[in-house]
Amino acid sequence: GKYLGTATAVITRDPENNRVNVGTYRQMIKSKDEIGLYTSPGKDAGLDRDKWWAMGKPMPVALCYGIDPLLFVVAATSFAKNESEYDYYGGIGGEPLETFLGDVTGLPLPARAEIILEGHVYPDATFAEGPFGEFTGYYGRPAGETPYVRVEKVRYRDDPTLTCALMADGKANEAGLFWAMLRAAKVWNDLEKMGVPGLKGAWSVPEAAGWGITVVSIKQMYAGHASQAVNLAAQCMGGAYFGKYVIVVDDDIDPTNVNEVLWAMATRSRPSESIDILRETWSTYLDPSQNPPEIRPWGSKCLINACMEYKHINEFSPRTKISENMYKAVVERWDDYGLDGDAPRLNVFEDADFKGKI
């Protein structure tokens, strides 16, 4: 079917505590005044909907298109269930988002959106929705019954702009880098909030569907530190959804450099001791690897400790490094040597007194 909602902001409210949620959910057009609203299990709009339905009421909802890019950023990020994306928008942007109350839903709506639809999602009102090419690079969820919005009011500007997000595989997924940055920032922030010390960096690999692989770099400070960091990174709100591989590396490894991460995995991890599996974790119907599709909301995660073993860290074999002076000399003459591409980026160099240590 035709999809209107890809790069969008969906506004809902928790009827129990009045928390306003802003999320990004796909919306397939059903008719001239009906549009689908698919939410993966555990996502906030779906939880809000279930609460409204448990009260015997339809859920009020607003669908917003042509939105401020920062609003899309926060809408596509996983925050704690009791936090509103509007608050993060104001914190990042330095001022509150300009809103007005919708007269159909009573929800605070972004005043600068190009198009806004207001309506309700009614219990037991579904239609056959999908499939849709998703962020994994697959038509992940087979067509299935999905709730839809009965649109009661439409607002739009003259000649409005409709924002869209291209879903594809690998580097063709324009949202991959976008989501990778958001996920990494949220994981890093969550770990800091939980008091994990020694954090040096976090990154999610864009080519791994943005969310599939996350790397955390730490300066080990005590026994169990690496295990603590990798386990919390896997299950914090920023990292819990869908991600399959979480890797922790030492502070001399750049988590954004896949080559360095792979080298650390190959030379510092011990497969029999360094790999743990978490089962029954938060996943999604959009994951094509799990079949039959009914089991997809329950996933698993592989945790890899690619740090030097802490109990023997002082005896760990010294790392071979190039001198910084030699590196700079080669970089300066890179083109003279007729070498293709850019010089490799290095950020770890031999200590001046290294020779006296071996």
Question: How does the language model describe each region?
Answer:
Residues G1-C64:
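Internal mixed beta-strand/loop scaffold within catalytic domains of large alpha/beta enzymes
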Residues D68-I358:
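Charged, compositionally biased interaction regions
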